[in-house]
From Swiss-Prot:
Presence of keyword RNA-binding: yes
Protein name as annotated: Threonine--tRNA ligase
Enzyme Commission number(s) from the entry: 6.1.1.3
InterPro entries: aa-tRNA-synt_IIb, aa-tRNA-synth_II, aa-tRNA-synth_II/BPL/LPL, Anticodon-bd, Anticodon-bd_dom_sf, Beta-grasp_dom_sf, TGS, TGS-like
Length: 645
């Protein structure tokens, strides 16, 4: 007689094994109609799953956020059936749900193109309208392999062969079509609804390995209703307008080319933006008593073996050999082992703790070419990386100080709110469970003391310790995980870091790994899209253009520019003979925040006509007033703040 506990705390008892369908019907016809799936003891399962013992049950309806992932998962199955209905020779591979949508990878001699989408979407709507039940079946392993091999589905057969011997072979059937899948699924294809759209195609190697066959990946998006779908498409349209790759070209900030895949050629204006941001971060770290260091980029494998990165991270490292010296080295993918070497260099005392060590460290990580994205996902990048060596008793205070610093930085850069995620131990990790218990407990206690509220992000910690992830929301509602704080007891032990305590004995420090921006490259990409290239004056690569109306005003334009430069502004002059409206249009497209227009009258009266980006009106100011106002506005927020103090 299973006792079923519902979310409101009420308990219903049933005579023998019961399904979610039966439980929902016992509560009422409305829920019986609306329930699409359920959670049993926190685990999502099919609505028809049998329950034979006491359990907590929560039903999932279309109104629930949890329904979205299942709608997208089922939409991937509907997509695969539609494709094979239209092109039976196509092999299906895998098709998961992802953020905002789903994809499915197909093997076909002729790759799909967006021109195929109307036919596929029409067939998908037919499958949804058929309202065919999803039925789970458990097959014998050998029978399943033989079935897919006989169908010519070699990829599916390979997937089954690679599954653990003790894993059930779960097959989901929707009418005559079926697929290998762990589930769970909704009740029927009709539960997917019609709020879906195919978005794009891309190439993808089977299992992400370039040595394997190239597949065609079809991406789609799916939502609970048309209103959500339309809102998402509107966000994508806005995101396209803000794409940092396009804006980067238009503003002449950077470029990437085939001879250096995944690495950035910073142009003058882009590098100016980079250095302004780096200088700002350097000042923030100095105010918070960080000592800046610099460590090598190319390091012997012995250090990576000792730290554990060689075992856990080698496939993402760029490795070099030195034949004459019989050495194997790697470009560092992160700075932490090198910072431990500095900490270990000489005898450390408890009086030096906490020791905050920062580096704008150049790192390299291998990313598949298909995963690269502008300057946001690259192979060569610079981290705003720091490591705090401290005692257990100092973790809470250091956490509070870091969060305060992070909040100030984000606010200065235009992000006033952020969320925090607590990521605990991953499946692949270094250190014993006892060490992880200690690390997770310390970080939770630190959050409690520091007043940091968080949501759980299970299994997503670093391989050496749990972490807090700080997630920004941008101007169009997208989330960006940037900052991190990680508690690490493992690396100091592995690399033999120690200090002399008050008792004159050696002790292991705790190592806090922390970053605020993450990488400069990615964060600059985020900033470009946050502001759509229309930066506040202090960040703008070119802050002011002085444009002359007539050639007679060229000398005065140069004088104005020189005066602004002397006040510390980044200024360009435009004394070409082009019409002033053409000049204004050109510099507005380049997203220059301020254009100062000067002609004969302005030269005679020593004034300027100031135009703001996006504004039609001009403000007439004396040269001295304009310089004073712009110099004040162009101050970085932290400098302006401390000037007031």
């Amino acid at each position: 007689m299973p006792a079923i506990t519902l979310p409101d705390g009420s308990v219903r008892t049933f005579d023998g094994t019961v399904t979610g369908t039966t439980i929902a019907a016992s509560i009422g016809p409305g829920l019986a109609k609306a329930a699409m799936a359920m959670e049993v003891d926190g685990k999502p399962v099919d609505i028809g799953t049998e329950i034979s013992s006491d359990a907590s049950v929560k039903f999932i309806t279309r109104k629930d956020e949890d329904a979205l992932e299942m709608i997208r998962h089922d939409a991937a199955h509907v997509l695969a059936e539609a494709v094979q209905s239209l092109w039976p020779e196509t092999q299906v591979t895998i098709g998961p749900s992802i953020k905002d949508g789903f994809y499915y990878d197909f093997s076909r001699e002729k790759p799909f193109t967006p021109e195929d989408f109307p036919a596929i979407e029409a067939k998908m709507r037919e499958i949804v309208a058929a309202n065919t039940p999803f039925v789970r079946e458990v097959w014998d392993r050998d029978d399943a392999i033989r079935f897919f091999e006989e169908k010519g589905e070699d990829f599916k057969a390979q997937l089954i062969q690679d599954l653990p011997e003790d894993e059930q072979i779960s097959i989901y059937r929707q009418g005559e079509w079926l697929d290998l899948c762990r589930g769970p699924h909704l009740r029927t294809t009709g539960d997917v609804g019609t709020a879906f759209k195919l978005m794009r195609v891309a190439g993808a190697y089977w299992r992400g390995d370039h040595r394997n066959p190239m597949l065609t990946r079809i991406y789609g998006t799916a939502w609970r209703d048309k209103k959500e779908l339309d809102a998402h498409l509107l966000r994508l349209e806005e995101a396209e307008k803000r794409d940092h790759r396009r804006i980067g070209r238009e503003m002449d900030l950077f470029h990437i080319q085939e001879e250096a895949v995944g690495q950035i050629f910073w142009h003058r204006k882009g590098w100016r933006l980079y250095t302004v941001l780096q200088d700002y971060m350097r000042r923030a770290q100095e105010r918070n008593n960080y000592e800046e260091v610099r460590t090598p980029q190319l390091v012997d494998r012995a250090l990576w073996e000792a730290s554990g990165h060689w075992d856990k991270y080698r496939e993402n490292m760029f490795i070099a050999t030195v034949e004459d010296e019989d050495k194997t080295l790697a470009l560092k993918p992160m700075n932490c082992p090198c910072h431990v070497q500095i900490f270990r260099h000489g005898l450390r005392s408890y009086r030096e703790l906490p020791l905050r060590m920062a580096e704008f460290g150049a790192c390299h990580r291998y990313e598949p070419s298909g995963a690269l994205h502008g300057i946001m996902r690259v192979r060569g990048f610079t981290q705003d990386d720091a490591h705090i060596f401290c005692t257990d008793d100092q973790i809470a205070d250091e956490t509070a100080k870091f969060v305060k610093m992070l909040a100030e930085v984000y606010s200065d850069l235009g992000f006033d709110t952020f969320r925090v995620k607590f990521s605990d131990r991953p499946e692949t990790r270094a250190g014993s469970d006892e060490v992880w218990d200690r690390a997770e407990g310390s970080l939770k206690k630190a959050c409690e003391i520091a007043g940091v509220e968080y949501e759980y992000n299970p299994g997503e910690g670093a391989f050496y310790g749990p972490k807090l992830e700080f997630v920004l929301t941008d101007a169009i509602g997208r989330d960006w995980q940037c900052g991190t704080l990680q508690v690490d007891y493992v690396l100091p032990e592995r690399l033999d870091a120690s200090y002399i305590g008050e008792d004159s004995n050696r002790h292991r420090p705790v190592m806090l790994h922390r970053a605020i921006l993450g990488s400069f490259e990615r964060f600059i990409g985020i900033l470009i899209e946050q502001y759509a290239g229309k930066f506040p004056l202090w960040l703008a690569p070119t802050q002011v253009v002085v444009a002359s109306i007539v050639s007679d005003a060229a000398d005065y334009a140069n004088e104005v520019a020189a005066t602004l430069k002397a006040a510390g502004l980044q200024v360009e002059t435009d004394t070409r003979s082009d019409k002033i409206n053409a000049k204004i249009r050109e510099h507005s497209l380049a997203r220059v925040p301020v254009i100062l227009v000067v002609g004969r009258r302005e030269a005679e009266e020593r004034k300027v006509a100031m135009r703001r980006l996006g504004g039609a009106a001009q403000e007439i100011l004396s040269l001295d007033d304009a310089v004073a106002a712009l110099a004040k506005e162009a101050q970085a927020p932290d400098i302006a703040r401390f000037a007031k103090d």
